[in-house]
Amino acid sequence: MQILLANPRGFCAGVDRAISIVERAIEMYGAPIYVRHEVVHNRYVVESLCERGAIFIEEISEVPDGSILIFSAHGVSQAVRAEARSRNLTMLFDATCPLVTKVHMEVARASRKGKEAILIGHAGHPEVEGTMGQYSNPNGGMYLVESPDDVWQLSVKDENNLCFMTQTTLSVDDTSAVIDALNTRFPKIVGPRKDDICYATTNRQEAVRNLANDADIVLVVGSKNSSNSNRLAELVQRMGKPAYLIDSAADIQEFWLQGAKCIGVTAGASAPDILVQQVIARLKDLGAGESIELSGREENIVFEVPKELRVEVKQID
């Protein structure tokens, strides 16, 4: 069996920044550090940060007075932000991915201008909740759609005063179909100046598509609640190849590999490389040969952490 590695795969700039913010806060201010929601959707990362002194909570009311609080990479609503600022907290850091913040600004701009806004995204995802929560104009409207069917069933106040934006971690193909439906249903709707689906999501979907062309099966390293990891597995399955979303090498079932001559491996944007290396080692134990990395798009984007945290600290092992 041959192992093929997708390129790029794994951590993106937004995830790197979010994890660094938590690590550096622990290093500089000591444990515990409170984080609203999982800082990124990866079990290994969350468990590693818990071991170092991070406490993950869902409600601001769970944070004791005088504590340090960090918002996750997925972003928060204006209501959550206001609640946190009203508390007696020592420090408040925002680990929201800058590309999510870009979408937040688009929604806030629409709200100020009185335009109705339509968000393409998955209901219940924290990024969607945070993005929807940027709209506050009572005379306008904020709507969520997930599919072309949702678009055709949508009722708005003024079809001539609409804009749309998207969750950053969606399937490029699925989103294109929804945008086509929006443009057909509402010819005067205005989209973002630049695509809201982030570079890392797009690059990883392109890379796994190339990987699936050559692989018999594909293993996607990522947690079940990771939106972008799920989209990678779905893309492969739509190409007619088996794909399995795994948290770690321990999840690999030997029968998956029966008859496979080429095993593809990729990782979602919130999955650390150590997990990929463990998967490679496990596959070699099961008889696979050396791994070969495919060519792909180079990524050199870096997002700075807040200036208060710009010191060198140890990284997660």
From Swiss-Prot:
Amino acids binding isopentenyl diphosphate: H41, H74, H125, S226, S227, N228, S270
Xref: Gene3D superfamilies: 3.40.50.11270, 4-hydroxy-3-methylbut-2-enyl diphosphate reductase, catalytic domain
Keywords: 4Fe-4S, Iron, Iron-sulfur, Isoprene biosynthesis, Metal-binding, Oxidoreductase
Alphabetized GO MF terms: 4 iron, 4 sulfur cluster binding; 4-hydroxy-3-methylbut-2-enyl diphosphate reductase activity; metal ion binding
Binding site for [4Fe-4S] cluster: C12, C97, C198
Keyword Ribonucleoprotein belongs to the record: no
InterPro entries, alphabetized: LytB/IspH
Active site: E127
EC number(s) given by UniProt: 1.17.7.4
Note on cofactor: Binds 1 [4Fe-4S] cluster per subunit.
Residues involved in dimethylallyl diphosphate binding: H41, H74, H125, S226, S227, N228, S270
Name this protein carries in UniProt: 4-hydroxy-3-methylbut-2-enyl diphosphate reductase
Species, as recorded: Yersinia pseudotuberculosis serotype O:1b (strain IP 31758)
